[in-house]
Amino acid sequence: MGIPDGSLLDLIDKVRSWITSDSSDSLFLLSSSKQDFGIMPIVSKMCHDCGTKVEQGYCCLSCGSCWCKSCSDTEESKMKLCRECDAEVRELRVKSYDKVHPRDSPDPPSSLATESESLASSLEIRDCRNMASIRCYPSRGEEEEARYCGKQLLSPSSDNYQDSSDIESGSVSARHELFSCKSSAGSSPHDSPLRNNFSPLGRFVQHAKDLRSPTVCSFDNHQEQLLADNLVKPGQGVLEQEDHEEEEDKLQQPLDFENNGRIWYPPPPEDENDDAESNYFHYDDEDDDIGDSATEFSLSSSFSSHIPTKEKLGENSNEPLRTVVHDHFRALVAELLRGEELSPSDDGSAGEWLDIVTALAWQAANFVKPDTRAGGSMDPGNYVKIKCVASGNQNESILIRGIVCSKNITHKRMISQYKNPRVMLLAGSLEYQRVAGQLASFNTLLQQENEHMKAIIAKIESLRPNVLLVEKSASSYAQQYLLEKEISLVLNVKRSLLDRIARCTGAVLCPSLDSISTARLGHCELFRTERVLEQHEAGNQSNRKPSRTLMYFEGCPRRLGCTVVLRGSCREELKKVKHVIQYAVFAAYHLSLETSFLADEGASLPKIRLKQPGMVRTASQRRIIDEGISLITQSPTETDSQALLETAAHEDEHTAPMPEHEVCESLCEDFDPTQIFPPSSEVETEQSDTLNGDFANNLVTRSYSSNQLNDLHEPTLCLSSEIPETPTQQPSGEEDNGRGEEENQLVNPQDLPQHESFYEDDVSSEYFSAADSHQSILVSFSSRCVLKESVCERSRLLRIKFYGSFDKPLGRYLKDDLFDKTSSCRSCKELVDAHVLCYSHQNGNLTINVRRLPSMKLPGEQDGKIWMWHRCLRCAHVDGVPPATRRVVMSDAAWGLSFGKFLELSFSNHATANRVASCGHSLQRDCLRFYGFGNMVAFFRYSPINILTVLLPPSMLEFNSHPQQEWIRTEAAELVGKMRTMYTEISDMLNRMEEKSSLLEPEQSEACDLHSRIIGLIDQLVKEKDEYDDALQPIFEENLQIQGSLDILELNRLRRALMIGAHAWDHQLYLLNSQLKKASVFKTGDDNAPRNPEMHDPPKIDRRMQEGSDERDEQSHTDSEANGDNKDPENIPSPGTSLSERIDSAWLGSFQNLEKAETIAETEGFSAVNSSLRRLARPIRVQSFDSAIRFQERIQKGLPPSSLYLSTLRSFHASGEYRNMVRDPVSNVMRTYSQMLPLEVQKLDLIVGSAPTYISSASQMADGARMLIPQRGLNDIVVPVYDDDPASVVSYAINSKEYKEWIVNKGLASSSSSSNLNNRESEPSAFSTWRSLSMDVDYIQHAVYGSSQDDRKSPHLTISFSDRASSSSTATEGKVKFSVTCYFATQFDTLRKTCCPSEVDFVRSLSRCQRWSAQGGKSNVYFAKSLDERFIIKQVVKTELDSFEDFAPEYFKYLKESLSSGSPTCLAKILGIYQVSIKHPKGGKETKMDLMVMENLFYNRRISRIYDLKGSARSRYNPNTSGADKVLLDMNLLETLRTEPIFLGSKAKRSLERAIWNDTNFLASVDVMDYSLLVGFDEERKELVLGIIDFMRQYTWDKHLETWVKASGILGGPKNASPTIVSPKQYKRRFRKAMTTYFLTVPEPWTS
């Protein structure tokens, strides 16, 4: 949105001419920057009404529509708006009247014309250059004066956690060397970083309503008047604003900073006289008189005359400001005196020093006025000098408005005192200069010298000086002649002293004798010398007191220097006081400038009220002026200036309650600045924003020795004053008052007494200065061009020393760096208004935008006037824009404020600098601060930034993650459904059999027993089903996350138990059906009876298996008889015996051993229907695995069974005990398979492998999983194998006994490979037994490194096993053979012991994985992710596997050292590499795949963006950025960084750089390149999750060839970008540099 062209006066005339016109255009001026008013030539336009091409006509001033002359004549003689726009303007005009708030606007206008005339006059910017008005400060009203009476507070100084040598240190102007090229062409930005930014309240700022054409700009003068009328007047209650704060937030409208020109348009001035063109910046010397002595100090005489207010108000109006400033400054001086071991108490001279130093420092700081516009030094220390005189009383110390030096006149007869003297300064020496190379006699030389001196003295006398100061010596002739002429001569004056005298007196130093005639003399009120006798501890040999002569130049006309003369009896004490004054002057000087600046901005003291009574401690050794805490008297004009100054306790044990209605009036003696932070419950703000306290709440200094500082290892709070700290030592002879570095002053919160507490929230967000430097701020600066969308200057650290040689006054920074219309950027050649400048510090970013107003100028450009105003973004918008305060002229003091201090105020959180008197919102946080000069306007906007922390791959992997449990719920739900379906089928079959058995002859004993057995089976079925329901029910409870994590291994065990139970029930039903058929045949005697279609023949029995069973029966019977078979039914037999009989009974399909089966059933503890030996044994309820024993032990001890969930405390131990906390649901599964003999295993395998006869759902129980009966894993872990999931095959293999046994044996055989392996308990196994089941273990010497005795020899393990297909449809296909080769099995096992809580966690995660379409990869290899998202499974190509085998020993060594030492590393840990082979017998198809198991860096994280960074710009851009899990590349990141830089804390940045340095150094040493840094943004936790991946590729010959081809450009590609593939060393350097550039650091308040 633009501003109308042409002169503003012409515009006003047009507005006035329209006032009497038609009402449609009487109020609004709608114009376009590219159009003129009225009739104009129109080229290639079509008439709006008739559609004909017109060459001349009228255009609508709003939408640009045109009419031909004939159409316009038919309507009106003069058309300015079309009908549509005219109607819209009328409607807008009517609405605008209703928008005027009653309390914010004056009385309604009496007529339309009156309002319009007043509008025009208010918008008129008059040219009044002839109205001379010499003013030191702009004028304000009394209500406005009451607002800024608290703006004097010093902000805490910034932290400096790095030495200057560590960063780029330079001036503010140094960074603006970027804008050095001159350019006459102007441009304006078309983009802005704030266009997509959010306001401090998180609202998107966007223009509310545009007119029809976005290119046509309209400015509504009436709306501007409404905006001015709606400005909240100073003095209006803040409480009313608070009550409507929520309503105001809701009323905010979207705002477009770039296209809404009214945002940039300056508001009316606060003082109409400020619009006058005048020579504004002149000092008013009428107020310079500070009195003859500063011996006595009082509020009325000292502070009232030096408070920097806009105009002198009444005493009552200034009282709160003077009180706050006085108390604050006295407290600061008192703390500085304590730092020099001068306790400011009532006793002794130090108490008097407090008043003296406070008075002298304040007066000196307010006297000097550095001429910063002329390039003078900003440092007040260069203008205030301190002389220590060890003579007299300390009360005789005085401030001299001029120069005092230790000099004397050359001759005693020369005049030593002048009033209003004329001072002449001469460089060099006052002697005759003999011409070299010429011969002359002695007499001739004397004569020549005499004549020459006469001539020189004659020239000097012609200027009529009274005092002549010469840098070096003077000849005796010259001295004699000067004595005769009554000119006092001073010799051997240092050049620096001459410069100071010249600066203060106005004299010009003569460089040589030849330029005496053109010299300019200086003036002062009084020149005098004084001889003083000093007192020293050790006198000289003659016991005479040493004397010195002081020379005074008093009453200098220019306020560019003064001298503080300290008197006292002890020189050492005077030196300490001198140090205090040096820092106190600096603080007072900045306090004055900051107060004026905050007053110009409209800031006020925060209004705070006590919530609870405070505690005031008393100390006898400290003087307390006020009794307790008193309330500042509130007057009607002091509403916005009332301040509660908190009182912190003295370090004393005794406390006294403080009345709730009392507040502190004096800060100096009422509080100990080491204890200024009250409990958070004691104070609260009246506003919604957080109270962080004013400057008084930030004043804490405490001196520590260097030894004490070295002991502070914990993060410390730097509770020190923002002003420079007192140096511990300074050379006694040092004339300059340079503020040297001082030892750190840190307060560790742990060192504070227990009764002291901090604002925990406020202290963390409060702005504190660092201990290493209190005189500079460290910021990150960057610049970008919005026109070319390029980064002109990447972010770099910039240290700005306050008021130092590299600092700039705020006014000069604005004029030279922002408002210079000719300077252009060296990088993009564009002007400054096409750029966006950003300064970052702590958690904030200060964005600077500049706009050139094309059609208006602010007055006072020739006089250097800079205007200030602001717009609050949180207040209700007026006509679509935030309300603006009236603009004021930047005062002279604010002009000279340090730009570094300005930045510190902008980033500071202390309450004084964050208040706006008119609305109570934060000035720095919630407002746009505008500065205008001529037709240039700049605004500063603060926006919070997220300081991200860096999360490196953890040393110990986390497995207990609740969000990833949903898939287990789904698995459990499916299992419950199948279980219920199965038991429903069994129940239906038993019910039908029960009906058939009831039809048998009741007199037959067999029929009666059979019926009873069926009834018992039905009861038992119900019990089993209930037990499964109880085991699975907790899965669906709501408090899942409280109980722990679901265990997929337990679900696997239940699934396998159900599958075996289903087949066992199917065989039982078959046997039961056989008995029913036999009974039916016995009843009817008809052998040819038709068979029940539901009844089937038993499967054919392998004769070998049957014979084996018979032999087993015999052996079991013999053993039973030998041991005494007639036992109590409560006794439990051997699990192997009962399991053998149970398998035989299910296998043989007969009742040949029913007595034995029944006995076994009884001894198992299961109740039978009756004791008949003819009864069929019910399904045996056996606890799976060895957990049955533990289950019974828990019951006997009275402990409940453990739940299905994993304990959050990790129930298993390093020994592998997994089942100790997992509940075993009851099922009809046989006892532990580890106790089964091979023959029994084969029988069970045939039972499960056969198709079920009666239970159709049994075949669907496995659901595609190979349950592999029996399981060979330890600790009862069941791992199913899926054909489409190679990771499950790996999980099964590493859980096998063979793998564990091999690892243990290998560790024992080679103890050097891993000493930790001996700590693991080796469990016994029947390895020889399993060998009979075709289990083979191969030891492969896969690679040989050097000799056979080389420690780098790494054997690999191959485990092979097979399984029959799980479903009946594929049972005939034969057994599927699996083979897993574990590369570097021992080394990876050792690594997992270090990184994983237990091997079971690793097995559990790998047991279930799913195919994953990873984004960003180009290799199209197999990718999978474990269902718990803990691991990534990636296929490894042969070249990568070969490379890894080559550097694997170094990899394991590097990780071991990093994990053990805690050294940071970014490497994403590889926890295993395996080769999986699956061979199907049908067709002989074999699948081989090399897999790598790597930790998932983003486990349990909500990642919003993912970047794959290599540090290269070649082919590193992903144009498709939409969709979830899209992997972006380097150029995508650089594109984002232009507007959204990534900021890291200094500690996080150092940790990241150190990790990258370590890892890249290792990878380069093993010749690896082409790795990537995978970065994920977790916005919820504000973390940067990252790790280095793809580090398995060495720089082999094919990569050499790729580098050469890409570098030559044969295959195309960008020529200015280096190839992605380079040598490892080059890759390392490029990678390090890029990662350092990508992630920026922001200076933080705390250092480590």
Curated annotation (Swiss-Prot):
- Domain PIPK, by residue range, is 1316-1639
Residues crossing the lipid bilayer are none
What Pfam families has UniProt attached to this entry? Cpn60_TCP1, PIP5K
Q: Which GO terms describe its molecular function?
A: 1-phosphatidylinositol-3-phosphate 5-kinase activity; ATP binding
**Source organism superkingdom:** Eukaryota
Kindly state which keywords UniProt assigns to this record, in alphabetical order.
Answer: ATP-binding, Kinase, Nucleotide-binding, Transferase
Region annotated Disordered, chain positions = 97-116, 241-276, 721-746, 1083-1139
Q: Specify the signal sequence span.
A: none
User: Which reaction equations make up its catalytic activity?
Assistant: a 1,2-diacyl-sn-glycero-3-phospho-(1D-myo-inositol-3-phosphate) + ATP = a 1,2-diacyl-sn-glycero-3-phospho-(1D-myo-inositol-3,5-bisphosphate) + ADP + H(+)
Q: How does it assemble?
A: Component of the PI(3,5)P2 regulatory complex at least composed of ATG18, SAC/FIG4, FAB1 and VAC14.
What's this protein's name? Putative 1-phosphatidylinositol-3-phosphate 5-kinase FAB1C
Q: Give the species this sequence originates from.
A: Arabidopsis thaliana (Mouse-ear cress)
User: Which gene name does the record give?
Assistant: FAB1C
